Amino acid sequence: MFTVGLTGGIGSGKSAVSACLAARGALLIDADQVARDVVAPGTPGLAAVLAEFGTELANADGGLDREALGRIVFADPAARGRLEAIVHPLIREETARRMGEVSPSGIAVHDIPLLVEVHAEGTYDVVLVVEAPRELRLHRLEGRGLPRDQALARMANQATDSQRRAAADIVVDNGGSLDDLDARIEEVWQDLLARRDAKATAKATAKAETVASGTDTAASGTDTAAPAG
C-alpha cells in the first residue's frame, strides 16, 4: 500500500482535491469524518464521552451535541485533554482499520487537516499540501457562512503556509478553476503511481537481496564445514 497524507489550511480546498484523487481510484480516509464516526449514536466512544462530560451533551436524536462539547473543551485545556484521551485512540484504531481495507497495490489518501501541527509527516510515503491565496480562502469560508473574524482566528491557530511547504513532497495550487485543479491532480496522480511503483520495486529488490544473502551464507557454511572423520 502507498500512503498519502493530504493537508492544507482551512479553505484551501482539500475536499476538492480529495474528490479528484478518489475519482482516479484512491481510497479516501477523511480524518474529520472518522472523528465523527467514532462518537456516532450507539458507539462506545459516544458512551465514554457522555460518561465523562455529562449525558446532557446528548441531543434529541441520541447523537452528540458537538457545539456544546466544543464550548466546554475549547475553554478548558484540561477538559480538552480528557476528551482527546477518549477519542484519539478510537480514531487511530478506526483509521488503521480503514487503511487495512486498501489493497497492497492501492493508494490511500488520508485527509488530515492538522497533519503538520501534530508532526505526522513521517507517517506517510508522500505528504501532499493544498494551497490557495489567503483572500480566496477567506471568500470560500465566508461563502460557507463562517464570519471573516472567525475564519481569520482559525487560520491563526493553524500552521503557516511556509511550515506546510517545509513538510510537503508535493504542493497543489488550488487558486484557479476546477478544470485547472483537475488537470493538476492528473499530473499528481501520475506522480503518485510512479512513486508507488518505485516503492514496490525497491521493496522487491531488497527482499531478493536478503534471500540471496541468506542463500550465500548457507552455502558458505556448507563449503567450510569440516569433513566427518
UniProtKB/Swiss-Prot annotation:
Main location: cytoplasm
Region span, Disordered: 203-229
Pfam families reported for this sequence: CoaE (PF01121)
Catalytic activity: 3'-dephospho-CoA + ATP = ADP + CoA + H(+)
Keyword set includes Cytoplasm: yes
Enzyme class label: transferase
Residues reported to bind ATP: 11-16
SUPFAM superfamilies documented for this protein: P-loop containing nucleoside triphosphate hydrolases
Any one GO MF annotation of this record: dephospho-CoA kinase activity
Pathway(s): Cofactor biosynthesis; coenzyme A biosynthesis; CoA from (R)-pantothenate: step 5/5
Domain DPCK, chain residue ranges per copy: 3-203
Keyword tags: ATP-binding, Coenzyme A biosynthesis, Cytoplasm, Kinase, Nucleotide-binding, Transferase
Biological process according to GO: coenzyme A biosynthetic process
UniProt EC number: 2.7.1.24
Cellular compartment(s): Cytoplasm
Annotated Gene Ontology cellular component terms: cytoplasm
PANTHER family: BIFUNCTIONAL COENZYME A SYNTHASE-RELATED, DEPHOSPHO-COA KINASE-RELATED
Family annotation (HAMAP family): Dephospho_CoA_kinase
Role summary: Catalyzes the phosphorylation of the 3'-hydroxyl group of dephosphocoenzyme A to form coenzyme A.
NCBIfam families: dephospho-CoA kinase, PRK03333.1
Annotated family: Belongs to the CoaE family.
Name of the protein in question: Dephospho-CoA kinase
Species this chain originates from: Frankia casuarinae (strain DSM 45818 / CECT 9043 / HFP020203 / CcI3)
